[in-house]
Amino acid sequence: MPTSWKDSGLRWYWIVVLVFIADQLSKQWVLSSFELYESVKLLPMFNFTYVRNYGAAFSFLSDAGGWQRWLFTFVAVGFSILLSVWLRQQSTKMWRLNLAYTLVIGGALGNLIDRLQHGFVVDFLDFYWKTSHFPAFNIADSAICIGAGLIILDSFVSGKDVKKSDDIKE
């Protein structure tokens, strides 16, 4: 375990701040510039559309009656603490996991603030094909998904790195 926070994954925490600020600024812009369900076409297959998400990813549990707000708050706080502890315990050189954890934390905190402030998450990135729309999402959701993907990738790549080092020792 690193002896100082400067030698640990916490050195990557600036990414949490960057994701959080980008997410919150984009959502404030949407709230001040769009009416609910207002949509602006930017590119073929891509709109800015202001929607409210009372659930989790892909509107999971959005019609559950309100209790899910506190469940998702607890989950966001819990995962942010857990990943921060893991960041403190790993080397700053573990760039893929450090990046992944900080992306997830930044995204979780961005959506957490929405839930606490508004009771819902502001979503606005709307991709579609013909008449089929992918569920709208935001910068925080993107950061969480990219972070989760990097964690999965690291589990495969790290395993290969360990195998290579074992082969070299033999």
Curated annotation (Swiss-Prot):
Keywords: Aspartyl protease, Cell inner membrane, Cell membrane, Hydrolase, Membrane, Protease, Transmembrane, Transmembrane helix
Enzyme Commission no: 3.4.23.36
Residues forming the catalytic site: 123, 141
Cellular-component GO terms for this entry: plasma membrane
Family annotation (PROSITE patterns): SPASE_II (PS00855)
Keyword Calcium: no
GO molecular function, one term: aspartic-type endopeptidase activity
Disulfide-bond pairs as recorded: none
Gene Ontology biological-process annotations: proteolysis
Membrane topology: Multi-pass membrane protein
Transmembrane intervals: 12-32, 67-87, 94-113, 133-153
Pathway connected to this protein: Protein modification; lipoprotein biosynthesis (signal peptide cleavage)
Record's catalysed reaction(s): Release of signal peptides from bacterial membrane prolipoproteins. Hydrolyzes -Xaa-Yaa-Zaa-|-(S,diacylglyceryl)Cys-, in which Xaa is hydrophobic (preferably Leu), and Yaa (Ala or Ser) and Zaa (Gly or Ala) have small, neutral side chains
Main subcellular location: membrane
Domain of life: Bacteria
Entry's localization field: Cell inner membrane
InterPro entries assigned: Peptidase_A8
Function of the protein: This protein specifically catalyzes the removal of signal peptides from prolipoproteins.
Similarity section: Belongs to the peptidase A8 family.
Listed PANTHER family: LIPOPROTEIN SIGNAL PEPTIDASE
Family matches, as HAMAP family: LspA
Protein name stated in the entry: Lipoprotein signal peptidase
Species per Swiss-Prot/TrEMBL record: Shewanella piezotolerans (strain WP3 / JCM 13877)
